[in-house]
């Protein structure tokens, strides 16, 4: 877990961590060193002086802190805001950094962008030296000049991990929220490791927060307005008692923090500097959390924009805790908000659920490591077995095989070393992933233990995403050995003595699978579906990864793949009726695809057998008699479809009227699967139908009524539907006699039998019928 608690800039445990807009964390002192100015601000600054590494960092940190206080004071800086980059130079000139400046200039207008590291900025972090003061000028004058130059400039900070840059507003680095949970976890982690003997006295003394000495000097004063601890030298350099600091009150450092037991019982890392009334500044977190401990810690975290208000709600749009003033008068006024406690519990539950997945993967990884170690032992044992066998065979041919024996032993050893290397590489890789996942899991568990809802919600989204990414890295093949413990080597000792010098290992290479055998006794057809079964021939030693089943189009066309997988039984539905299909299958493995099997010919049913489909019918439709009888519970017309779909061939089915009350208008015909089901069939463009009462009938499509024909239905009548997709026509019959002319021509596509009726009608479906040859002539239509 320690890697989760280290700053990506300094590599040490986090000190006063702040949360960047990209959800990554960085120490506040480190943030001051990596903050940069945009080109608008850089053009007002003098050419920076090249400093040594130590003096540059020291002066940069001191100037940044000093200018942060000056900016907060207000009058001296002319409203330059709290830019933490105020004491930093404009960056060294040159081709590499010039591209970086252009990148920042084009993206930080939006407050968020990306940053591409140049040759002069390794790891994506630019640490700029401070602007030197003009010769002979005082420190205050230098700060005043720097502040005046910053009044018309803006600054940005680049994340050292994802290289995204974010603009700093008038508050500077104080505008970023402090990660109180991470700070508390770091403190608890340090206490858990235990203090080194002889360092307890030093740890009990408050230290200067601006010293870059190792170790830092003890703090001599604490500014109540800035909430920063200073040693004597840093106080004179960074916080002189003149200018905007003249009204600041310097006091003695607070007492040391309580023992670990007391610190664990109270809130940690939440202290903020006390607000002042006269333009005083307050760094985010300041020294209160790190030095004063429980003596100045607040019980509840406060809103950075309304410092006297506690967090009470959670803004869903901005994903941040807010106070009630933010909702009434701030930028969150019209945003969606939810109770803080509810969102805290919800995000904790999400993180816990994600952790369960990572925990399962970690458990599998541990078991996998055990398996790999067993493979190591098996490889050793199998290698020894092969060596012993080889020695025995070579001893039988002492005179002729002496020199050849050494060569063969070398090959076995190389094979063994290769396998061992592969397994060790996989162990190291898996161990690294496991350690990363375990560290992340321990860190997340520590986060869950915290009882700070707002702090938790500040980092929960990022943690959930990281946990999900960590879970996704354990892909399917990651927990499978890359090599086998078996040695695919065989020594053939049969050849004659004259062939001894050609004696070598026969390595069994993976070959393509042989031809699969179709199991014709298990292959069958039912209605418009076919089932095929196959198996591999006996004594097949080649591995099989899967099979490919191919089927033609039922008209002698080209084959196409209809199934790819490991099963040896497959059923294909939705084929054409009265059609002949050819099928074949082949196997494949890592070496390639094997040859095709013999082709099997399958004939689908000559006629269609189907029922009403309970899944596609309207909810008011009532089906019975094994889904062959339909009625309705509503007085309105409702639609039900059949289970078959037709796109070619000639099909005929009949519907027997079991009940007919109060002269309703049932409709019979065909429709697309997307037909509207809460009105009469034929009123939309997805259905072609004939609706009929007790006296006459009409054809209807797109709500267009045509071909009124005398003759209706009653109880006991039979309505026939003839769909001829070879001629693309639809014809209707009543009691064996054609009703009117051909109802519709030029019908093309996929159609399903359809029916609409209300509660006054009940019909029974009869399918599997041959097309009648003795149908009567059509009745003349009335129009």
Curated annotation (Swiss-Prot):
One term of GO molecular function: zinc ion binding
Zinc finger extent (B box-type): 206-253, 298-340
Domain COS: from-to ranges: 448-506
Ranges for region Disordered: 247-295
Ranges of biased composition (kind: Pro residues): 252-261
GO terms under biological process: negative regulation of Ras protein signal transduction; positive regulation of neuron projection development; positive regulation of ubiquitin-dependent protein catabolic process; regulation of protein localization
Organism: Homo sapiens
Subcellular location: Cytoplasm; Cytoplasm, Cytoskeleton
InterPro entries: B30.2/SPRY, B30.2/SPRY_sf, Bbox_C, ConA-like_dom_sf, COS_domain, E3_ligase_FN3/SPRY, FN3_dom, FN3_sf
Protein name: Tripartite motif-containing protein 67
Pfam families on file: ANCHR-like_BBOX, fn3, SPRY, zf-B_box
Domain of life: Eukaryota
Encoding gene per record: TRIM67
